[in-house]
């Protein structure tokens, strides 16, 4: 059985085998994306299926109901709202976690039958700026490259992307290519010195938001040194004269660009020279480019440089937008954005007429609907009365999170299709619908290189969980649209989607998979990965687009665009006493996914970064008077967050980084998007998640503690953060309003506890009979403790000797996990170096296995080798 990973946009293939009742998972060696490799998230997919709060039945207002009642209620409410307020009062919010078939049915129902374009997706938050940039430059949303181009290039530029963490398998492919071909150079453009930047030949830590300046400067440099391809521009590109005139501005001269970007002249010149002399260049860009007040312009600035040099449509040469989710591309194909119609068609009269004739639908939208941020504003003001959210968690993932939660709580009818009831959004729903999870649902997904792959079901549907397309189809039938939604299998939906892509397509739309429209069900079930287009001209798919220099514009030419630098307005507010002003960046951790609905309950994925932690530079820590592990409060006019603080020497001073993953399920005050203003790109509507202005202050506490228990910590405290353990959970605790004695009085009144004094504070053991149910350590500062050792006591009989011995070992302190794949800690690596004499990477890999799988920990291992081998011998 073969399927596709549920996580990032690399789209790795997975092979499953069954031994008795147990499934085994490994990478698919034949899949073109990964060739058998998997990162730690992909390798732990089977573990993720054990959802602690799996939603198995529909619920209305918290009460279990059947599907018939749920769908009848939904249809009645939708029909009433449509009759009273019209189609604009209905909205659907989708996800890049859905299959293409789910997306297609939702889009068709909304735009062709209900007559509402208020259907958008969380891909708006990650890829919509790239979509608009492609449309402006190429005439259509087209990714011209494939992953092989990274291996064939002589220069790879990674910008706005910590690829080593966010797309580990693809980064590993790049690193392996560099090992085979040392002439392949890697340049990383990123304000942070990330794990990706650590491995580059050159890292340019440019000023946040200055990307247009840097790329305009490159284009100006190419003109100055005659480093552009005159013949290619003359034959295949329009807009050169306007761009050249705009680049004549002194702002784009080398010295001024270096100053504006905060870079040394020599580093910037080195990059420009390298780019100018390297024909085989791939520029890979991701959220650091897209999630901006001018993400579209940033992407077009990159594309400008490639078009000027003719570096597109050739092996090893292309601008390459990486998607964040497994099916963000599929959503774009079907028109799952409010600014698209369907199958890469817009809202022109001829296009609307074409799609309506194909669907034979009773109505058709004639213009775009509300983009994501606008959509939830429309909910807030009551314009959208009913909202159906499928497979995403907007209460956490959208900017201005407090206002979004307020909008959701005001919504007249909030429907949420989810695999678990325990998300911040699901807890606000009136109607909860149990969705099929990865491994239970079947369909197709498209990755960043346009590869369509099958996602196959290998598990039965639990309880009354159903695929999302099934629920949408049954609603459509109840609303009287049965003829248009007679689907009984995802194969029928896919074939219709494929047929629409080729309908009246004379070659003007390069998204065309009509060659798959006639698949039998058996052929669909056996479909192997292939890149679109798939049609009469390209029956086996196509690796690269634009080889012939023809683009999807009316004149067949790509477009160069003059671009201006626009920094976001960042109004400074008076500093609070003891506060430090910081520019807040947000992004991903290596081992987590989105809002942790799928990964947050998997213990081994928590080990490398178990707690919500904001990282900042040494000067900021000093100014705040805090040390690593202390609590820091972040605030601005939108909201607050309270987190542990950590040092990151790779950050520019005055800047901070906070992961996006934490929700109210894992931390009392950890959601970063409560601090992010709803500033969006005016063209794409994509929010600016990378540049929030906050103030940071030290949070003083009366006590801090840590709880390891078989059950969750239930007592109210001022602050908490929770992580799962194989048997139970671990929770950090802190209070500034209550004394430790008051806490003990509450505990002693409610259960069987044994309290023991410690050097600084006390330890309390919760008992069930003579067995340990939980252990609480409390003191002025939280102890640094080996959680796994403490957890080993859970469920065991209380024995003073065992408790004392284990506690003394646990208090020796936790060693940071370096290699998540093989679960190798920093201390084990250091011991191998200092005690066993291992002095090189190959020796560590042979002894411990660290760094031998996805490779994202290699920079950290290199640092440890430098510190404990080379510096020790110096």
Go through each PLM region and give its residues:
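Conserved short loop/turn motifs at secondary-structure junctions
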Residues: 91-99, 259-263, 286-293, 325-326, ...
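Short beta-alpha connecting loops at secondary-structure transitions
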Residues: 198-206, 434-436, 440, 451-462, ...
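Flexible glycine/proline-enriched surface loops and loop-helix/loop-strand junctions
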Residues: 156, 199-200, 251-255, 284-289, ...
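Extended redox/cofactor-interaction regions of prokaryotic respiratory oxidoreductases
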Residues: 104-175, 182-189, 196, 212-216, ...
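Long, contiguous, secondary-structure-rich segments that constitute the structural scaffold
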Residues: 462-464, 468-527, 595, 599-615, ...
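Glycine/threonine-rich phosphate-binding loop and adjacent beta-strand/alpha-helix elements that clamp
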Residues: 147, 439-461, 472-478
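Rossmann-like nucleotide/phosphate-binding core characteristic of flavoprotein oxidoreductases
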Residues: 685, 690-693, 697-874
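N-terminal export/assembly segments and adjacent metallocofactor-ligating motifs
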Residues: 1-227, 235-239, 243, 264, ...
């Amino acid at each position: 059985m073969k399927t596709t990973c549920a996580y990032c946009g690399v789209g790795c293939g997975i092979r499953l085998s069954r031994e008795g009742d147990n499934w085994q998972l490994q990478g698919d060696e034949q899949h073109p994306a990964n060739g058998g490799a998997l990162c730690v998230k992909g390798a732990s997919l089977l573990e993720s299926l054990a959802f602690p709060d799996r939603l198995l039945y529909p619920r209305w207002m918290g009460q279990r109901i059947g599907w018939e009642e749920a769908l009848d209620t939904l249809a009645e409410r939708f029909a009433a709202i449509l009759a009273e307020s019209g189609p604009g009062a209905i909205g659907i919010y989708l996800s890049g976690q859905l299959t293409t078939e789910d997306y297609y049915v939702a889009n068709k129902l909304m735009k062709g039958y209900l007559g509402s374009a208020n259907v958008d997706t969380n891909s708006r938050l990650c890829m919509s700026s790239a979509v608009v940039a492609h449309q402006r430059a190429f005439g259509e949303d087209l990714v011209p490259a494939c992953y092989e181009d990274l291996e064939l290039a002589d220069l790879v530029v990674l910008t706005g992307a910590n690829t080593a963490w966010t797309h580990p398998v693809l980064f590993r492919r790049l690193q392996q290519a560099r090992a085979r071909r040392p002439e392949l150079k890697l340049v990383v453009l990123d304000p942070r010195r990330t794990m990706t930047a650590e491995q580059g030949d050159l890292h340019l830590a440019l000023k946040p938001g200055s990307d247009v300046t840097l790329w305009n400067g490159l284009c100006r440099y190419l003109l100055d040194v005659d480093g552009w391809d005159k013949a290619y521009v003359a034959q295949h590109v329009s807009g050169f004269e306007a761009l050249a005139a705009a680049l004549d501005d002194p702002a784009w001269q080398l010295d001024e660009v270096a100053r504006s970007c905060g870079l040394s002249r020599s580093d910037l010149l080195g990059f420009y020279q390298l780019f100018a002399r390297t024909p085989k260049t791939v520029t890979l860009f991701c959220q650091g480019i897209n999630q901006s007040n001018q993400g579209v312009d940033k992407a077009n600035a990159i594309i400008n440089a490639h078009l000027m040099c003719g570096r597109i449509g050739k092996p090893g040469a292309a601008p390459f937008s990486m998607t964040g989710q497994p099916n963000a591309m599929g959503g774009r194909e079907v028109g799952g954005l409010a600014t698209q119609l369907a199958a890469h068609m817009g809202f022109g009269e001829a296009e609307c007429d074409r799609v309506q004739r194909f669907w034979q639908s009773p109505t058709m939208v004639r213009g775009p609907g509300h983009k994501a941020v606008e959509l939830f504003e429309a909910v807030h003001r009551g314009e959208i009365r009913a909202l159906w959210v499928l497979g995403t968690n907007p209460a956490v993932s959208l900017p201005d999170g407090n206002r979004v939660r307020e909008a959701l709580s005001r919504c007249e009818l909030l429907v949420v299709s989810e695999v678990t009831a325990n998300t911040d959004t699901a807890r606000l729903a009136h109607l909860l619908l149990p969705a099929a999870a990865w491994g239970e649902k079947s369909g197709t997904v498209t990755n960043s290189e346009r590869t369509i792959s099958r996602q196959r079901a290998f598990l039965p549907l639990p309880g009354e969980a159903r695929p999302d397309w099934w629920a949408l189809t049954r609603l459509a039938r109840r609303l009287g649209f049965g003829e248009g939604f007679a689907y009984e299998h995802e194969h029928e939906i896919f074939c219709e989607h494929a047929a629409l892509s080729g309908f009246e397509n004379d070659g003007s739309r390069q998204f065309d998979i009509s060659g798959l429209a006639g698949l039998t069900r058996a052929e669909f079930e056996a479909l192997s990965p292939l890149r679109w287009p798939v049609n009469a001209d390209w029956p086996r798919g196509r690796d690269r687009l634009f080889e012939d220099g023809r683009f999807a514009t009316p004149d067949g030419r790509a477009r160069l665009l003059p671009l201006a630098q626009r920094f976001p307005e960042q109004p400074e507010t008076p500093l609070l006493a003891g506060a430090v002003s910081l520019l807040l960046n947000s992004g991903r951790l290596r081992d987590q996914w989105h809002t942790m609905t799928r990964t947050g309950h998997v213990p081994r994925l928590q080990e490398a970064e178990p707690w919500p932690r904001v990282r900042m530079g040494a000067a900021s820590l000093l100014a705040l008077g805090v040390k690593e592990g202390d609590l820091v409060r972040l605030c601005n006019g939108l909201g607050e967050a309270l987190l542990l603080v950590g040092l990151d020497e790779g950050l520019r001073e005055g800047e901070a980084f906070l992961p996006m993953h934490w929700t109210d399920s894992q931390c009392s005050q950890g959601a970063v998007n409560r601090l992010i203003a709803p500033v969006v790109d005016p063209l794409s509507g994509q929010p600016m998640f990378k540049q929030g202005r906050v103030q940071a202050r030290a949070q003083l506490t009366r006590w801090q503690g840590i709880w390891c228990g078989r059950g969750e910590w239930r007592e109210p405290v001022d602050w908490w953060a929770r992580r799962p353990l194989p048997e139970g959970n671990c929770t950090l605790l802190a209070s500034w309003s209550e004394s430790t004695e008051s806490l003990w009085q509450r505990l002693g009144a409610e259960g069987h506890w044994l309290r023991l004094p410690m050097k600084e504070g006390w330890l309390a053991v919760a008992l069930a009979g003579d067995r340990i149910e939980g252990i609480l350590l409390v003191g002025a500062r939280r102890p640094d403790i080996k959680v796994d050792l403490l957890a080993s006591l859970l469920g065991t009989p209380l024995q003073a000797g065992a408790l004392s011995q284990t506690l003394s070992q646990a208090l020796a302190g936790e060693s940071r996990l370096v290699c998540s794949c093989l679960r190798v800690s920093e201390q084990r690596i250091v011991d191998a170096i200092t005690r066993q004499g291992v002095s090189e990477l190959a020796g560590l890999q042979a002894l411990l296995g660290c760094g031998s799988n996805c490779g994202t920990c290699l920079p950290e291992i290199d640092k440890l080798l430098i510190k404990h081998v080379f510096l020790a011998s110096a």
